[in-house]
């Protein structure tokens, strides 16, 4: 016999293009949708950065000598390389046509997460403080609607031992980020000793399937009826400390 246990809904929403010059906030925009308690709102980081006017015009950037030299190796414009360096704590790996850095947030990713896609002009870094941004959006939504929701800001990142980019949570508020399941029992009564689930990353990846990573134009996703804890989780709790990273 097969029994239906869980049914989760994933709703992709098209919204107006965000420039940062709107006379409404993201919370006000999102609140126009009929939200329900325990909805999880996943927002593409591009939208958040643009709404926060975190876009740098190329003609305002003066590349350093380091950026100019690196640009020749990477095949990127010196201005783009300068922003990559400015957004990083350190360079983790450097090779022909690629640079992997640790960002100021602690993320290890290509190009410090710096992007030019889906931006009509300028260079777009990641949001300055994604957890803070997620929290402000969540609080704004709850004040307007009275609904208890979670917010995740997601981005696409590559994975070191697998091909293809995948959605990850860079900012989290109101929903679990890292789900510690140690002490729970499995189906056969054995106690879980080490299990920690990156549940916010799993939700971010789920949303990315609907968002797409090209010209789909769906930067906002509602995940409804997700069987996950709602608490004061953050994106930071998903970052492995450098001293715990056996590959660096």
From Swiss-Prot:
Binding, a divalent metal cation 1: 115, 155
Cofactor stoichiometry and binding? Binds 2 divalent metal cations per subunit. The ions could be magnesium and/or manganese.
Q: In which pathway does it act?
A: Cofactor biosynthesis; coenzyme F420 biosynthesis
Q: SUPFAM superfamilies recorded for this chain?
A: CofE-like
Necessary cofactors: Mg(2+); Mn(2+); K(+)
For this UniProt record, give its keywords in alphabetical order, as a comma-separated list: GTP-binding, Ligase, Magnesium, Manganese, Metal-binding, Nucleotide-binding, Potassium
Which of the seven top EC classes does this enzyme belong to? Answer: ligase
EC number(s) on file: 6.3.2.31, 6.3.2.34
The UniProt subunit note reads as follows: Homodimer.
Please state which protein family the record places this protein in.
Belongs to the CofE family.
| Task of the protein | Catalyzes the GTP-dependent successive addition of two or more gamma-linked L-glutamates to the L-lactyl phosphodiester of 7,8-didemethyl-8-hydroxy-5-deazariboflavin (F420-0) to form coenzyme F420-0-glutamyl-glutamate (F420-2) or polyglutamated F420 derivatives.
Name the record gives this protein: Coenzyme F420:L-glutamate ligase
Organism field: Methanococcus maripaludis (strain C7 / ATCC BAA-1331)
């Amino acid at each position: 016999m097969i029994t239906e246990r869980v049914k989760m809904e994933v709703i992709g929403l098209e919204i107006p293009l965000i420039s940062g010059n709107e006379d409404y906030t993201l919370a006000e925009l999102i609140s126009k949708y009929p939200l329900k308690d325990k909805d999880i709102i996943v927002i593409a980081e591009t939208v958040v950065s643009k709404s926060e006017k975190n876009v740098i015009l190329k003609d305002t950037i003066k590349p350093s000598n380091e950026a100019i030299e690196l640009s020749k190796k990477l095949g990127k414009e010196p201005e783009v390389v300068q922003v990559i360096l400015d957004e990083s704590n350190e360079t983790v790996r450097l090779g022909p046509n690629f640079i992997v850095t640790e960002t100021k947030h602690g993320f290890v990713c290509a190009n410090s997460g710096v992007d030019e896609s889906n931006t009509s002009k300028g260079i777009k870094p990641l949001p300055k403080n994604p957890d803070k941004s997620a929290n402000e959006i969540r609080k704004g939504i709850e004040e307007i609607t009275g609904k208890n929701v979670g917010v995740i800001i997601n981005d696409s990142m590559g994975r070191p031992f697998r091909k293809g980019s995948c959605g990850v949570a860079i900012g989290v508020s109101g929903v679990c980020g890292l789900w510690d399941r140690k002490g729970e029992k499995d189906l056969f009564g054995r106690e879980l000793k080490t299990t920690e689930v990156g549940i916010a990353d799993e939700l971010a990846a789920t949303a990315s399937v609907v968002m797409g990573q090209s010209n789909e134009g769906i930067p906002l996703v509602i995940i409804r009826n997700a069987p996950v804890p709602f608490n004061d989780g953050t994106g930071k709790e998903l970052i492995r400390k450098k001293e715990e990273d056996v590959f660096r």
